Design a protein with these regions (language model features):
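A Rossmann-like FAD-binding core segment of flavoenzymes
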Residues: 4-22, 27-28, 91-172
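Glycine-rich Rossmann-fold phosphate-binding loop(s) that bind the pyrophosphate
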Residues: 77-79
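FAD-binding core/adjacent interface of flavoenzyme oxidoreductases
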Residues: 2-71, 148-150, 161-163
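A short alpha-helix capping/helix-coil boundary motif
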Residues: 65, 89-92
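N-terminal Rossmann-fold NAD(P) dinucleotide-binding loop
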Residues: 82-83
């Protein structure tokens, strides 16, 4: 049978036929391991990201999209999650702009086609976010840089959704 165990794993040792799992409280010996660590949203690490968390910066369109009704929304990322969430956010936003550091999206073609066909979605290509600005209560604008030309631009957005990947919650 399967035995579920929960805890903070400090190390795993492969003994060949068995594995030793050391946690903060117990040691387990087993033949197989299923690791379900969960994940945290990857952050950009730009000025303003922490300060404006829950005040315009979000990592969950389903959770926070309605707060930005009739505003211009920026989505950073180019993969499936970023593009799918941008499409979802068109239900609320006046416009939704996808900013991607490359000149093409990485999302699946069918998802890209839906985004390109949506009149509410705009694109900023070859660009990276450099700073999030606001009035201490909410974000008002972002500064971004075109990675090919070096041109720096500031643009107004009421909401910012960041989808640049996930990091597994593991330190072993």
């Amino acid at each position: 049978g399967v035995e579920n165990a929960y805890g903070f794993v400090t190390s795993i040792v492969d003994n060949g036929a068995t594995k030793t799992i050391n946690t903060e409280e117990e040691v387990f010996e087993t033949k197989s391991i299923i690791i379900a660590t969960g994940a945290n949203h990857r952050k950009l690490g730009v000025p303003g990201e922490e300060e404006y968390g829950a005040r315009g910066v979000s990592y969950c369109a389903v959770c926070d999209g309605a707060f930005f009704r009739d505003q211009d929304i920026l989505v950073v990322g180019g993969g499936d999650s970023a593009v799918e969430e941008a499409i979802f956010l068109t239900r609320f936003g006046k416009t939704v702009t996808i900013m991607h550091r490359r000149d093409e999206l990485r999302a699946q073609k069918i998802i890209q086609e839906r985004a390109f066909a949506n009149d509410k979605i705009k694109f900023i290509w070859d660009s990276v976010l450099e700073e999030i600005k606001g009035d201490e209560r909410k974000i008002e604008s972002v500064r971004y840089k075109n990675v090919k030309t070096g041109e720096v631009t500031e643009a107004n957005f009421g909401g910012l959704f960041i989808y640049v990947g996930l990091d597994a919650v593991s330190e072993f």
